[in-house]
Amino acid sequence: MKNAAIGAAAVPAFGCSKGGSGASAPAGEMTMRENPKTGEKVSLLGFGCMRWPSLDGRSAREGVGEIDQNAVNELVDRAIAGGVNYFDTSPAYCRGKSERATGIALSRHPREKYFIATKLSNFAPASWTREASIGIYRNSLKELRTDYIDYMLLHGVGMGGGMEEFRARYIDNGILEFLLAERKAGRIRNLGFSYHGDIRVFDYLLSKHDVYKWDFVQIQLNYLDWKHAKQINDRNTDAEYLYGELDKRGIPAVIMEPLLGGRLSNIPHTLVPEFKRREPEMSVASWAFRFAGSFPRVLTVLSGMVKMEHLEDNLRTYSPLKELTREEFAFLEEAAERMMEFNTIPCNDCKYCMPCPYSLDIPAILLHYNKCLNERMVPESRLEPGYARARRAYLVGYDRSVPKLRQASLCTGCEQCVPHCPQRIDIPKELRRIDKYVQNLKRQAALMGDVKKKFAEGGYSCVVGNGEVYTFSRPGIEDLLDLYQNRRPLLKGALVADRAVGKAAASVLAMAGVAELYAEIITRPALEMLDALRIEVSYGKVVPHIKNRAGDGMCPMEEACRDAKTPAECLKILLSKTAAK
């Protein structure tokens, strides 16, 4: 049932309305959506306050520094000036400091100018008592400098222990009844819940809609999760189903993760030109926001905008919304299908897994792996084209993205992170897998070091490493041609160190499929040829051409290949010359 088609009612009539959802918003003005209960106009762009900037230059969710209140104020001021009026926070965000920073920034504006959404974030078992949970709620009012909450959520229902945990957090302690009473008293204007994880909890709460009268529900929705959430992680549920269940009950949807933790702003590089060809002036991220905003039951789409340029980009996207056409919706569905081929880890960078007791930067480790996977920089074998270059890019990028003392090699498998992950990733398993991969890359890099050392110490003309290390002493390209003709498998995926590599030798190496080359001397044409084929090359000196043995002209083999356009053409010339001898 969870993966079944939900019918046309749940899918927006892309391109069929008179100008779409943003038709009522003049050019440059924010698209607004109407709360069906109150009639209030809510900005289609909502401000997610999970990651306020901090004074140490990092997100306050991951850094140790204090929140940069001046930066928060500037972001809030610009958002309100741009038409944003929905601000979503939680007692759990920014190490417990988001509500205070949000309250300070918002209280500088008239209360009627904005809506506050916060959550009863009683995740720790110690906070499941009625007294502790009510204390969390009352502290939210204090921190947010308000006497009422516009949008109150049960936070992360379905996470952790599923139905059993949900009942302990909200039912058995009477907290849901308390919140319903607060709504009746007007201190909560709208009551809903945010959903992650166990679909039984989602279905149960919607089955009780006649009792609880949910005013809104917050779900994860984006063009990858629309049909592929369950494929990404079998314990997740496709957004198509979640939205459809809300739509048929007339419950407004608040959208989280429209960018899937940034993954939809950093899509595989092979897809970027197709997005840019359609909308050259728009960012790749804007497509994900247009997708989420084009569903008519969506009240607002949350975005955690720590940088002003991200805020400005999102304001452009929703001022007003340019609703997706049916053809564009089909394009995004096709793009999602192609993204699924990359098999990325479903980390959304929410950082609920942090801090790690052993100081690992878990999200950074997973996101670096995903980034390299999207860029086709996760090589598995030296036989792959561009292996050595991709290996180097992965290892260098890993050290830049994740300090050595926070890398996957230090994971102890304590599993403290596992129950906190909304995507229910087996984090220790993924960290072990990544570390195994990294260690293998390092071993391969060390093999090239062995080849270069052998070459430097032995005075050889050529050294080839491929499982074992082989040495050669004849001058010129005779050894390489002999290897190509008689022992070609030795060169496939090999690591090679050579005294002098010109266009002729480069052609032999390229056609044989070597993985990596070190040359004491290399010609510019040879370097350009190997670079075009993504073969990693290091060298001592670049020269115009290889000289003959007398030193008074060009090497005959180089001369013969001077006008050859491809490695194959050059190799054909070389083989014909050697056959003629």
Task: Please report, for each region that a protein language model flagged, where it lies by residue.
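Beta/alpha (TIM)-barrel catalytic core signal, keyed to glycine-rich beta->alpha loops juxtaposed to Asp/Glu
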Residues: E29, V157-L367, K371-A390, P419, ...
